[in-house]
């Protein structure tokens, strides 16, 4: 058990919720995507329950609606692992694979899980874009790539060209708190995807009505 705190917490969760997934949550989507979306970690009653990233809690509502609008998802909702939803040109993962207490992974846990993110990024096509949701995911991507944080600060809608041809675009996380406080609006989130698709010629077709940038 590489992360004793997380492993112990998952043991407790499985006892309280025997029907929950309560294990590391694998990535979901296209195995050779144009876009890799990196979140923070599974949510207690979302991915930790369902076994699919951003599925079953509020954080996935805006994400999957936007993915469907921009042609990446076959449906605007992700309900369960057996709902038939598919992603095309897109894959979703997390910086930390296991549910952390209070949704707050410790620095050592983020570092321990970074090897999985490193492998996921290494498997991407050279033209792929990476969308980091939130500062921790942004920093985890940079760590996985061996890049300095000070040279690539987290800013909403930032767009960094990476060595080898890939891009790192970052956004505020689509959490309930951020969307309810309007720190992140649907229009802001859609603008991030417009930015991603603006120079990604192999991406799915743009939506019928793109937001102003």
Question: Which residue stretches match the model-derived regions?
Answer:
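Intrinsically disordered, low-complexity terminal tails and inter-domain linkers enriched
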Residues: 202-212
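A polyanion-binding, active-site-adjacent surface
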Residues: 1-201
